[in-house]
Amino acid sequence: YEMQRSLVGSEMCIRDRSPEVQKACDAMNNYLKASITYKMTNQNMVVNKDLISGWVTYDDNMNATLDESKVKEWLREFGKTYDTVGTTRSITTPGGKTVDVSGGTYGWSVDEAAELTALVDSIKKGEVVEKEPAYAQTAATHDAQDWGTTYLEVDIPAQHMWYVVNGAVQLETDVVTGLPTPERETPTGVYSILEMKRDKTLVGEINPSTGQPSYRTKVGYWMRVTWTGIGFHDATWNPSFGGSRYQTNGSHGCINMPLDQAASLYGMLSMGTPVIIHN
């Protein structure tokens, strides 16, 4: 019934000249004046009268209202289309290997709650605007590889990492990643550098039998990737890096680096730099 009323609204405006109907028509016509163009990657997404007319309803007193639940539903689909956090992306290593990587915390994420408020406000004011949506989180670019051209990359099977700046490799080294067990493997996905600290003590999970941390290790250069304790750091206790060492003497999930390389990387790196870890 409500939907029918919203669809016949424009005809009603022509047929019925009563003050109540005219008031509803004025409100609806104001809504339908709105045109919000979201400037997205490959195409613009436009919210105009074609969409808005389906979101306007009338109550028994002929008050025209915007059904925010329908706007919210549309924004949820909009977010699904343009959010990239956790999605599958493709990367080609400096060595020429192309792999898919999914998961992680890095990428675009539309702030649907904030955008709902903004969109409803624009429609009610009958605004004509071009904009980007509100984002809860942004990435370097809207390209398919949204981390851009400056990033850290870790190839677990190759036990090798690269620091790429503006498309050119600035540093590369063999590494030791997590022991390949469910508890200790290095997580794959697209992340970013969350914290950088000198002379940090890494503390393992509490061992239930002793009540003590499973390890307490001091490192000179700490570059955090996840809040669950994964990061890049120097590992002076490792006699060698690369090869198959990780399969028997792997870390607890961190990316272990030679001291000189960890120091060099720390000196070059910026907070927020994207990190791609893949098999």
Regions found by a protein language model. Name each.
Residues 33, 86, 147-149, 156-158, ...:
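Extracytoplasmic
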Residues 103-183:
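Cell wall/extracellular polymer interaction/catalysis modules
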Residues 153-154, 162-164, 171-173, 192-195, ...:
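Structural recognition of the beta-strand scaffold that forms the well-ordered cores
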Residues 1-14:
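Single conserved hydrophobic/aromatic residue that forms the stacking wall/gate
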Residues 70-73, 77-102, 107-115:
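Extended, domain-scale alpha-helical bundle/helix-rich regions
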Residues 73, 204-279:
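Exported/periplasmic cell-wall-interacting domains
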Residues 158-161, 169-170, 179-182, 197-201, ...:
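Solvent-exposed loop/turn segments at secondary-structure junctions
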Residues 56-65, 101-110, 147-150, 209-210, ...:
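Second-shell loop/turn segments in exported
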